From Swiss-Prot:
Biased composition (Polar residues): 121-138
Disulphide connectivity of cysteines: none
Database matches in CDD domains: CAP_ED
Known partners and oligomeric status: Tetramer, composed of 2 regulatory (R) and 2 catalytic (C) subunits. In the presence of cAMP it dissociates into 2 active monomeric C subunits and an R dimer.
Entry keyword set: cAMP, cAMP-binding, Nucleotide-binding, Phosphoprotein, Repeat
Protein's name in the database: cAMP-dependent protein kinase regulatory subunit
Positions of post-translational Phosphoserine modification: 122
Family, as annotated: Belongs to the cAMP-dependent kinase regulatory chain family.
GO BP term (any one): cellular response to oxidative stress
SMART domains per the UniProt record, alphabetical: cNMP (SM00100)
Keyword Phosphoprotein listed: yes
Chain ranges passing through the membrane: none
């Protein structure tokens, strides 16, 4: 199997020269080798049934870029050469799928060639139940990286919201599973709207344009990818929706710079780590919120909503969590460690906090500046709830929080 035509590889996006290179600079990276699936109720069924039975352009496997063994072959197509009568996937040399010829039952039974007689799309290949995490023998992939690669990767993912809630072990697992994917040219199509998705991508450098066709998939012709709606730059990511919801790709992504770098995370690792960690995090916070006296009067579904809105933040000993006089933008629950409140012109701490205590509420209730500073006495972990979530979710306990204003002298918020 040629390394240049299979995932994973050192540079899977190598350009493949063909006779019609001069007509379109846009190439396509095909993530899937499975056949297209057409339902008998689809409007195109009748026309497909009455048409020729020869393989369509959209079903070609590799063109002339080599073997497709291993299930992750790469296909560079030119989708917009309408003058050559090509469909949305381009016309290349047709290569039969691995394992022998395609089934012939379709022709015998009157079904179109691309009806579901091949394998199902792999986007539905596994069912992941968060409650069964750890009950099977799944082992996350580990791709060795140099220190230089790790440094670049950490910088690329440091501000990505999808990784913000992971603990240190989960974060390391994700870093190990990511694979570097250099993009050597402009106008390379990384994913296509309507396709099944196998990877989630993080942008290390370069920019990628996002196109959406109202039809829901790439169409034939020079404008088949639709309208440009946005651009994704360094630190951004794309491809998560198709993996999270087992849905087709929602947009087409095309490289906008002559040289770019992506990091790719496969579907199973994405779902095992990111989605399961979100489920475990919710269960952990629901259990924690049950221990918070302030929230004991809430119903379970109300605590579940709060759990989904919380962000975990760690502070080392001696660091300031909130500062007196600053505008209030969040409410805090102390998850672990100890903290103390201080006021200007008052010697020593005015209040101490331990697991389950809360602070920062008064500035949000009354739209006033912070009345005190809260400093971490030890290494602490807090659950932060932003202003909007506070107003929306903590209405039922507002009276309790206001009573706390008078029961604690002076107030630490």
């Amino acid at each position: 199997m040629a390394d240049s035509s299979s995932f994973p590889g050192t540079n899977p996006f190598l350009k493949v020269s063909t006779k019609d290179d001069k007509y379109s600079p846009i190439q396509k990276i095909s993530e899937e080798e499975e056949y297209e699936v057409t339902s008998p109720t689809d409007p195109t069924f009748r026309s497909a049934h009455s048409g020729a039975t020869a393989p369509t352009a959209g079903n070609s496997f590799n063109g002339d870029n080599g073997s497709n063994e291993g299930g992750e072959g790469i296909q560079f197509n030119r989708p917009f050469d309408a003058g050559f009568g090509q469909g949305s996937e381009g016309q290349g040399e047709h290569v039969e799928p691995p394992g022998g010829a395609r089934p012939t039952a379709a022709a015998n039974q009157g079904f179109p060639n691309n009806y579901a007689l091949g394998r199902r799309t792999s986007v539905s290949a596994e069912s992941l139940n968060p409650t069964s995490a750890g009950s099977d023998s799944w082992t996350p992939p580990c791709h060795p990286k140099t220190e230089e690669q790790l440094s670049r990767l950490k910088t690329a993912v440091s501000n990505n919201f999808l990784f913000s809630h992971l603990d240190d072990d989960q974060f390391r697992t994700v870093l190990d599973a990511l694979v570097e994917k250099p993009i050597p040219a402009k106008d390379i199509k990384v994913i296509s709207q309507g396709d099944a998705g196998d990877y989630f991508y993080i942008v290390e450098n370069g920019h990628f344009d996002v196109y959406i066709n109202p039809a829901g998939s790439v169409q034939p012709g020079p404008d088949g990818i639709g309208n440009k709606v946005s651009t994704i730059g360094p630190g951004g990511s794309f491809g998560e929706l198709a993996l999270m919801y087992n849905a087709p790709r929602a947009a087409t992504i095309v490289s906008a710079d002559p040289k770019s770098t992506l990091w790719a995370l496969d579907r199973i690792t994405f779902r095992r780590i990111l989605m399961d960690s979100a489920f475990q995090r919710r269960r952990m916070y629901e259990a924690f919120l049950e221990e918070v006296p302030l929230l004991s009067s809430l119903k379970p579904y109300e605590r579940a909503k709060i759990a989904d809105a919380l962000d975990a933040i760690k502070y080392p000993a001696g660091s300031t969590i909130i500062e007196e006089g600053a505008p209030g933008d969040a409410f805090y629950l102390l998850e672990s460690g100890e903290a103390e409140a201080f006021k200007k012109d008052v010697e020593g701490p005015v209040k101490s906090y331990r697991r389950g205590d809360f602070f920062g509420e008064l500035a949000l209730l009354d739209d006033k500046p912070r009345a005190a500073s809260v400093v971490a006495k030890t290494d602490v972990k807090v659950a932060r709830l932003g202003r909007d979530g506070f107003k929306r979710l903590l209405g039922p306990v507002e009276d309790i929080m206001r009573r706390a204003e008078y029961s604690a002298k002076p107030s630490p918020s």
